């Protein structure tokens, strides 16, 4: 009975769906539109077996389109998860072919790679390196554009690292989902579709491609170092911080509209991966009552990003410790406001800090990722300072 299609004549109408669980007093039914409902047995007048069976959560295989030469890298996350209908939790991992089948992409995926499968909250900086190496492998196998399926919680960290670590990139779209891919409400279909359009475009940049609004008609491509997850659950969780998105992709037409005229075009030069990394860097958010002695822990680090208040400030109590640390390690100042700029000369506190710290633009997360990249590239403090200022 479980997994079979039934027609139920009930007190409130006729319903067709697959039985995915039977309890003493009710059936749990999966409707053909993907939603699940419960029907009390006492409300069923008649039920008919329609002689069709499924495995719960099973998807058809993808069909070749005959155009395109894209690569697909799977790293885990909600986009590749299924709901376990027995527990109600999101846990099981889908087969990659199932994931690609649900989106019915307009271009063919020719190369598939998966360096690891993790939820993004479990990723560490060394995983960013593995993603970049996977991108490099996929490119060398002939991919002309690449989609990276990734958990959304820390996707903006990974996209920022890939942005710095790849020279002359082909179009690379990081994407994910806020709803698991077997749900009727999933955002994975539009996100994967839009990512394939971006990956086949003439934009030579690493980007995050996700829903533009809560509706299913457009997605946006955001530069990898400018994207940030700004909502925990909404489909349009990712926003472009302090600059316009690169492009808008329309669904289902597939039209790509350039928004940011300062985009980098796809290059004829070979893409080169330079995955520099040193994890002896930290991101520290200051707050009222922050104890300066906390900074003692980081004395043996090589760099610190301070997410300051307002335009990049800290309390006066932190200045002596930060000044002392700056003799041996890089101190960068950014703003925890997320939107807006830092500036060292508007307030006197900024002038004090700028005597030994470097003011940086962009999000705290982007500057933390940039720091770890630069620490892996440069060996001395002067070189670190110059490179942190030079890179966007």
From Swiss-Prot:
PROSITE patterns in the cross-refs: ASN_GLN_ASE_2, ASN_GLN_ASE_3
EC assignment: 6.3.5.-
Active-site annotation: 78, 152, 153, 229
Catalytic EC class: ligase
Entry-linked InterPro entries: AsnA_fam, Asp/glu_Ase-like_sf, Asparaginase/glutaminase-like, Asparaginase/glutaminase_AS2, Asparaginase_C, GatD, GatD_N_sf, L-asparaginase_C
Catalytic function, reaction form: L-glutamyl-tRNA(Gln) + L-glutamine + ATP + H2O = L-glutaminyl-tRNA(Gln) + L-glutamate + ADP + phosphate + H(+)
Family the entry assigns: Belongs to the asparaginase 1 family. GatD subfamily.
Protein name, as recorded: Glutamyl-tRNA(Gln) amidotransferase subunit D
Species name: Nanoarchaeum equitans (strain Kin4-M)
Gene: gatD
